[in-house]
Amino acid sequence: LASGRDADRITALIINDIGPELPDAAIDRILSYVGELPKFADFADAQIWLRTVYAPFGPASDLFWQRMARTSLRRRDDGQLTLHYDPRITAQFTASRHELRSWDRWQDIRTPCHLFRGAQSDLLLPDTAARMCASGPRPGLSEIGDCGHAPTLSNPSDIKALRGVLRNLRR
């Protein structure tokens, strides 16, 4: 959208730990837990699963994980809980893996943007982030310590940084 015919609809763009090139190993890691919906007996079991699988998100408060469980789950007909998303979301990663390299579209983005990267991210590698900052819309870069893919941007220091970035992008 940001590089297409409707690009003028977007006035600022925050990119959270993703880029125009995605490493196969990171895609395989994500596919290992996204393809089949797990089942949980209760919210406590679901929170344990979420905290484990999404540990790369980095440190987050208990309130964050409780909210994530409340907003990420749905009750099945059999009374169990499961994640509330379309498991076919993975089709984009398996059907057209060659399209996960889209530097040409990156070059076309003209919208002011900023890039957040988890310091231990396996999805947005340091070289990819550096290349992004030197090409296309040339975003600013904020690296979030103690996390991989993807930073939650939910703790007070991250929220403060995000607000500052948004203020600067809107100028």
Ranges and model annotations:
Residues 1-24:
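Conserved hydrolase catalytic core segment
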Residues 12-14, 114, 140-142:
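A structural signal for isolated positions on well-ordered beta-strands in alpha/beta enzyme cores
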Residues 16-57:
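Internal catalytic or translocation cores that form aromatic/hydrophobic pockets or channels
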Residues 21, 123, 147-150:
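Active-site loop signature of alpha/beta-hydrolase-fold enzymes
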Residues 41-96:
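Conserved alpha/beta-hydrolase catalytic His-Asp/Glu region
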Residues 74-135, 143:
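Conserved serine/cysteine hydrolase catalytic core
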Residues 144-159:
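Catalytic histidine-centered segment of alpha/beta-hydrolase-like enzymes
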Residues 161-169:
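C-terminal alpha-helix
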